[in-house]
Amino acid sequence: PAIARMMESHGIEAYVSIQRGDSWADGIYNILSEEWANNGGVELERIRYAAEVQEFSSYLQQAENVLSAAVDEYGIEHIAIDVIGFQEVATMLQQAQDYPTVYEVVWFGSDGTALTSQIRDDAPDQASHVNLYSTLAAPAESQKYTDLYDRYWSLVGMPYGYYTACTYDIGWILAETILESQSTDALTLLDLQYTTAFNSFGASGWNRLNEDGDRYAANYQIWAYRLKPDGTGEDYIAGLYDFVTGQVTWYTQEIGYTPPTR
């Protein structure tokens, strides 16, 4: 629900979905579409493109037609694009500037467009222009995470994100269950992992698992793109979705404005 709440909190009433044609994007779209409809939002169009596509003009024209027709009804500040993709979105953004309404509305995304080097490096002007607010699961703030972040950054020059922290925690949980059971049998370890994870506060936060064996929901940071004084792009955190309260906090000093309301 994080993407839906993010768009609602930015005053969006109607949006166009542009997504990769694969199971990953379909999964995100299906959750978003249901959450969006449940809160009275309008989905103007669903546009699905093949994962290998590098020419987006026909899809962008389709979005332009739909969005330009919606401006009079909703207002430009209340319509948006939600894009579900990966590094190909950099190419899409470069081409989007030829479509005035598409390029004027705010864009939103998911973890596939957060902290994406191709977008930051190849389309910094365009990403900054449309903001491309993208959700990314957030690690708990702790000294453990901060220490690892600093060490990781010094070694590889990249942020130490939530998924990297989860991978680190998985390694520790696996090691602890192997030592406890004195076994590497998968079924033996599986029985121990719920308790071990429940009692573990790792780099990513509390490692508690749900009944399906998946990590419990986390908060989501909202990442965006902006230009540095030298004209290159950079990532920054624009807000936070709190999964406990279901509320979004926008960091207005960072984004430079107060988002409109519905």
Describe each region flagged by the PLM.
Residues P1-D98, A140-Q143:
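Extracellular/periplasmic Venus flytrap/periplasmic-binding protein
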Residues S9-G11, D72-I76, Y99-V102, P124-S128, ...:
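Extracellular/periplasmic catalytic domains that process cell-envelope and extracellular macromolecules
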Residues L93-Y168, Q182, T249-P260:
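Extracellular/periplasmic periplasmic-binding protein-like sensory domains
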